[in-house]
């Protein structure tokens, strides 16, 4: 959005368009463990949020992990994050991380996905 001002201007700003909201994925069989989700949040903020966005809400240049089916698999996520499977695509390798770290991040992302999915569903019910 580009804003231009005039000293004698009387115009008001148009409403800000709503943020593009992806539909988070959920696996109902996945049980989020709150302690792991809390640890995962700390790890996500430290290692992931710079690219994948605060609260796991990506800005568009990288995958929004709340809507990624890859994150539903601990093995696939570990292969990308620890083993560097997507380095050629710009995803850095975090070889120092352990599978337990990835599991904690996975719990955080599932927790965020469920919270955001609930918000989106509640919003859909109030606007119809």
Predicted features and spans:
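Short, cysteine/histidine-rich loop/knuckle motifs that typically chelate Zn2+
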Residues: 50
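Blade-level signature of beta-propeller repeat domains, shared across WD40, Kelch, NHL, RCC1
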Residues: 1-21
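Residue-level detector of flexible, active-site-proximal loop/helix-junction positions
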Residues: 9, 72, 98
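Solvent-exposed, flexible loop/coil residues
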Residues: 2, 69, 95-98
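Flexible coil segments in periplasmic/lumen-exposed cytochrome c-class electron-transfer proteins
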Residues: 14-46, 54, 89-128
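Active-site lining segments that contact anionic ligands and/or coordinate catalytic metals
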Residues: 2, 45-46, 60
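Gly/Gly-Pro-rich "capping" loops immediately C-terminal to redox-active cysteine motifs
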Residues: 41, 53-86, 90-93
